[in-house]
Amino acid sequence: MSDFQKEKVEEQEQQQQQIIKIRITLTSTKVKQLENVSSNIVKNAEQHNLVKKGPVRLPTKVLKISTRKTPNGEGSKTWETYEMRIHKRYIDLEAPVQIVKRITQITIEPGVDVEVVVASN
């Protein structure tokens, strides 16, 4: 191998060993599925002996819509209220790149949105 190739390989190894900070944000309207996904991520992090914080429970957003029950406007003026609750959790991890890739490749239940943000060092 030439010197250039050796330097490139060494640089790639250093990047893989470099510890990065990531924040995984989970969002869902279904609490059980959200808790299952967050517990799976935490278990994987504990198996790899990673520095973790969380899952941190963020305040639940409640979206409400009020509508009239009767479509034609006649009759008594009765109203119907609908609401949707949005639950959020986040988990902070510190780990090398390869281990983070393994942890984030878990199966995610339908209805759970996952956002992964990598902090710059």
Curated annotation (Swiss-Prot):
Lineage top rank: taxon: Eukaryota
Pfam families: Ribosomal_S10 (PF00338)
Major subcellular site: cytoplasm
Numbered residues of crosslink Glycyl lysine isopeptide (Lys-Gly) (interchain with G-Cter in ubiquitin): K6, K8, K21, K32, K101
N-acetylserine carried by residues: S2
PTM notes: Ubiquitinated at Lys-6 and Lys-8 by HEL2, to activate the ribosome quality control (RQC) pathway in response to stalled ribosomes. N-terminally acetylated by acetyltransferase NatA. Also partially acetylated by NatC.
Record's keyword terms, sorted: Acetylation, Cytoplasm, Isopeptide bond, Ribonucleoprotein, Ribosomal protein, Ubl conjugation
Gene Ontology process terms (BP): cytoplasmic translation; maturation of SSU-rRNA from tricistronic rRNA transcript (SSU-rRNA, 5.8S rRNA, LSU-rRNA)
Molecular function (Gene Ontology), one example: structural constituent of ribosome
Subcellular location per the Swiss-Prot or TrEMBL entry: Cytoplasm
Similarity-based family: Belongs to the universal ribosomal protein uS10 family.
Known function: Component of the ribosome, a large ribonucleoprotein complex responsible for the synthesis of proteins in the cell. The small ribosomal subunit (SSU) binds messenger RNAs (mRNAs) and translates the encoded message by selecting cognate aminoacyl-transfer RNA (tRNA) molecules. The large subunit (LSU) contains the ribosomal catalytic site termed the peptidyl transferase center (PTC), which catalyzes the formation of peptide bonds, thereby polymerizing the amino acids delivered by tRNAs into a polypeptide chain.
Subunit: Component of the small ribosomal subunit (SSU). Mature yeast ribosomes consist of a small (40S) and a large (60S) subunit. The 40S small subunit contains 1 molecule of ribosomal RNA (18S rRNA) and 33 different proteins (encoded by 57 genes). The large 60S subunit contains 3 rRNA molecules (25S, 5.8S and 5S rRNA) and 46 different proteins (encoded by 81 genes).
Protein name per Swiss-Prot or TrEMBL: Small ribosomal subunit protein uS10
Organism the protein comes from: Saccharomyces cerevisiae (strain ATCC 204508 / S288c) (Baker's yeast)
